[in-house]
């Protein structure tokens, strides 16, 4: 009996699996019109793991909120003991503590299709949704007085913009205010596309301004760190405070006195 050559069959099967994999990847976060897999890997929260992620101090400095294994936890920095605060079928990340210590807002990723905002009542231990659609919401952060939340969303057109929305008692009050809007660079940038993005808002202590990262009119990287008023179309009054070929994880954080900010840098790499 002559041996049968399986090489073409193996090649066909391998190519079939590759095709299925690429098709599945193409379906990730369909609401996003920019970024692609590069953004998914370096900007969105990581896949579930045992590694703590996105730490945030409680206002009294007694606890640290972290994302870990798809849930939000609070960690005692003295003992290292962690207590799970949230759990459901979504992947939770990016916790941010309200200034009064009563709430934690966070993101909920549903099977790499959409990312929503949810909020935890620390007194009752119950969470409820703040957004429920097919868009992407990231980087939620309370204003210094707790009356507003800044966040990033792909609503309504699929590009990443910064919004501010009033909140009270764990519920929205009023409509979102667009700090930035869609803007075209004019040509397709490697990894980043032609549509500008505006991400990772951080409040200044007076609650009147934000630092954001944006590649608005920037040819390389995820952009510069901009200082913008926290008002509608504040991006039109933006001032560049750091010009660097940044990456998604720059994530500026402003000091309590408002005189400095820390960030992740590509300088020297």
Please name every model-derived segment.
Residues 8-19:
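Bacterial N-terminal signal peptides
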Residues 56-62, 95-103, 140-148, 201-209, ...:
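Blade-terminus and WD-like Trp-Asp/Gly-His loop motifs, strongest in beta-propeller folds
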Residues 26-46:
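Short N-terminal segments immediately surrounding and downstream of signal-peptide cleavage
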